[in-house]
Amino acid sequence: GAIGHRIVQGAEFFTKSEIVTDAIIDKIEEIAPLAPVHNLAHVQGLRSAKKVFGADVPNVVVFDTTFHQTMPPKAYMYGVPYEMYEKYAIRRYGAHGTSHRYVSMAAAKFLGKDPAELKMVTCHLGNGSSITAVAASAWTPAWA
């Protein structure tokens, strides 16, 4: 068995799920200013899980932002000076990616279609809400 952790913010550093190491935890903590309430709680949870369950039980992190990694620069850049992006990582990252990925794949299965053939809009409604245009099982801006 393993312990799975959904991490809200992976910034541009995490493009896939990862087996947790101390370096991974440190990086999640480093990027916490992008999602301070969530990522700092994730760090506490990761450290606690490692302490309680030990090295015999692997911990895996899944990032909500991974699904949105295919977003092109024209979609994720804001109309602010580029230096703000470089210095403070100010950009659009996308939200609720694990939910949007699941819903888009489930919709394709329900329709009996290859996800690569579909264009759809998925909605995540919960404590937070988001809408994402999906094409070929990846994020695409509605205007593309």
Language-model region placement:
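Short beta-strand-loop/turn "lid" adjacent to the catalytic site in phosphate-handling enzymes
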Residues: 1-38, 58-60, 66-75
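Alpha-helix boundary/interfacial micro-motifs
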Residues: 18, 23, 40, 81-83, ...
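A gly/proline- and charged-residue-enriched helix-loop-helix capping module
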Residues: 27-45, 88-91, 97-101
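Generic secondary-structure signature for well-ordered alpha-helical cores
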Residues: 33, 51-55, 105-113
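Conserved nucleotide-sugar donor-interacting segment of glycosyltransferase catalytic cores
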Residues: 40-59
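Non-transmembrane, aqueous-exposed alpha-helical and coiled segments at domain scale
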Residues: 53-56, 61, 120, 130
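Glycine-rich phosphate-binding loop of actin/hexokinase-like ATP-binding domains
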Residues: 69-144
